[in-house]
A protein has these predicted regions:
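Active-site metal-binding motif and surrounding structural segment of the metallo-beta-lactamase
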Residues: 38-88, 172-175
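Short active-site oxyanion
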Residues: 28-31, 83-86, 152-153, 199-201
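Short internal beta-strands
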Residues: 85-92, 178, 202-205
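Structural motif
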Residues: 57, 153-155, 178, 202
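Metallo-beta-lactamase
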Residues: 82-140, 148, 226-234
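Binuclear metal-ion centers of metallo-dependent hydrolases, dominated by the metallo-beta-lactamase
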Residues: 163-176, 185-237
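Conserved beta-strand hairpin/beta-sheet module of binuclear metal-dependent hydrolase folds
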Residues: 1-46, 140-160, 176
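Active-site metal-binding loops of divalent metal-dependent hydrolases
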Residues: 8-10, 36-38, 61, 135-137, ...
């Protein structure tokens, strides 16, 4: 399982930092957690077929996590028509908005496979298993645990605060925990990461003001190999 951070910025893009989008590659199959960038452009740059995308998992509906999804849905509706991923939305009303936007361009919309996210098991295609737990960042926001090839990765997604909604159950025995770093000092993760004791921690979606807190957290928990995600960074599990 290979993770590629296509965008690792917080709520707004910065120089050489785009909004949230992580590509997960398992063999020749591709999945995305959030799509705050025009991911088809990245696939094209890498010579990867759009048809290889099998699943898209949105943590919540804020634009910095979804703005690339309309572009993706538009292009697979009329051009990359062999692409048929399952698209998991925290709010299924988003489907109607995407379809309406595509219709404004006079392109016909396909019956894409949108799915409503709920607590528990949401996806299993025999290659990747995904479980979800609701968080308190918005009225409908989720953390995801991805399992493939004997490895487990937790994406916290955006949280209210760790003491309110850190997904302890999904963190158990995780090889990698990917934490957000935009809404509270990263040092607040300390007791929860100590308890989970993952093999590695990557702080993603972080704001500049939080970098000193991330560095402090890294010094406090050296065995967890805490690092910060950067655009284009690849991690092999």
């Amino acid at each position: 399982m290979t993770l590629t951070f296509l965008g690792a910025s917080h709520g707004i893009p910065e120089s050489h930092r785009r909004c949230s989008c992580t590509m997960v590659t398992i063999g020749e199959r591709i999945y995305f957690v959030d799509m705050g960038v025009m991911a088809i452009c990245d696939l094209t740059d890498r010579g990867l077929p759009v048809e290889a995308v099998k699943g898209i998992f949105i943590t919540h509906m804020h634009g910095d996590h979804t703005n690339g999804l309309i572009h993706f849905a538009d292009l697979i509706s009329w051009y990359y028509t062999a692409s048929d991923p399952e698209i998991f939305l925290p709010l299924l009303e988003g489907k109607e908005i995407i379809d309406s936007w595509i219709a404004l361009s006079c392109h016909a919309t396909r019956d894409l496979r949108y799915k409503q996210v709920a607590d528990g098991s949401v996806f299993d295609d025999g290659f990747l298993k995904v479980n979800a737990v609701r968080t308190q960042h918005t009225k409908s926001s989720f953390s995801y645990r991805l399992e493939a090839e004997g490895k487990a990765v937790l994406f916290t997604g955006d949280l209210r605060r760790p003491d309110a909604d850190f997904p302890k159950g999904l963190a158990k025995d995780a090889d990698l925990i990917i934490c957000e770093g935009a809404h509270f000092p990263a040092t607040e993760y300390k007791p929860f990461l100590e308890e989970a004791s993952p093999g590695r921690v990557i702080v993603n979606h972080y704001a500049p003001w939080n970098i000193p807190h991330i560095m402090e957290l890294s010094k406090a928990l050296p065995d967890l190999h805490i690092t910060m995600a950067t655009d284009g960074m690849e991690v092999e599990l």
